[in-house]
Structure formats: C-alpha cells, structure tokens
Amino acid sequence: EIPYIFAETSLRNKSKNDAENNLIRSTLELSAAMIGGADAVFTNDFKIQNSDALSEEISFKQQIVLAYESIINVFDDAGNGSYYIENITQQFAEKSWKLFLEIEEAGGYCELLKSGTVQKKIYQHALEEQKWIEEGKLKLIGVNLYPKLEKTKSAEDLYSAKEIKKVRLAEMFE
C-alpha cells in the first residue's frame, strides 16, 4: 500500500523583504510536490510579514492554477521516464536506506532523539547551511543575491535628535 503524502511549502527559503520571489519559490515547491506525487498540498502565505486577504487568496489559488491549468494532476506519475528524476530518486532512496540502517543500529529514532543526537545533527547542518548563505555558496535571489534594497523608511523615521533609539541598520529596508 502506498502511503498518503502531504506536502507543505517551506518557510525556510523565504524573505520578509521579497514577497514576489517568495511567490515564485512557493509555486516551484508546489509544482515539485505535485510532480512528486503528493496526495495533498498546503501553501503557506508567500508574505512572511503583513499577510492580507489577497496574499492568502493568491497562495490558495496557486494550487488550483497548477492543478487545472498545467495539467500536472492528470498524470499518475508526471516524472515518469525522466532520467534526472529517476536517478535522483534512486540516489535519495539509497542514502535514506543507509541512514535508516544506521539509525536502527544505534537503537532507533526514539533513542537518538532522547540522547540529543538528532537535535545535534539538525543544529550542525543548520549552521553549515547558514554559512553557505553567508558565503554565497547557496544563493537566494533577493536575500544574498540581488537583494531588494528599496527604502521603506527614511533616516528621519528611524532616528530622533531628542532621544537615543536602538536601530538596526537594515530597518530602513524592511
């Protein structure tokens, strides 16, 4: 029996300063989920900050447009026959099975969770990934590549001659 697969768009790669690129990223994520055979998908609002009725509606309608206008949903296996997809899936399955066996040998997932091993591995990878962003090895348009630097506040809005305020340098762009 094939398990029921639920997919959700990620917030990890989104920027509060670049809703337009977030919309593109979430559309690609939805496409990947549908091509990958997800039974259900959920779209997070592409506006990380100050979401509104329109952004919620657009996020919802992304799924409908992809399903009915791209005809992805017509195929049982939209990626069938694609060498790249088949190859990467095989690699993923092999690495996953190896990791599964390592987890079992170490006493199982619950044991590794109790010992803090799972948390430590996630933390180490998160630091490594953040370093890739900082060094530009992993690029996010609008974040570390072609950042949106449109001012939304003036210096007069942020600072006052009458009082000393804590102000982050990036605040005028957010």
Language-model features: where?
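Core alpha/beta catalytic barrel or barrel-like domain that forms the active/cofactor pocket
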Residues: 1-16, 31-49, 67-86
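Alpha-helical transmembrane segments of multi-pass membrane proteins
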Residues: 7, 25, 117-121
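Conserved phosphate-binding loops in nucleotide/dinucleotide-binding enzymes
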Residues: 14-24, 90
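Glycine-rich and small/hydrophobic secondary-structure elements
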Residues: 21-35, 60-66
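Glycine-rich, charged/polar anion/phosphate-binding loops
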Residues: 25-29, 48, 127-128
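Histidine/acidic-residue-rich catalytic or RNA/ligand-binding cores of hydrolases
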Residues: 51-56
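Catalytic-core signal marking the mid-to-C-terminal active-site face
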Residues: 57, 61-174
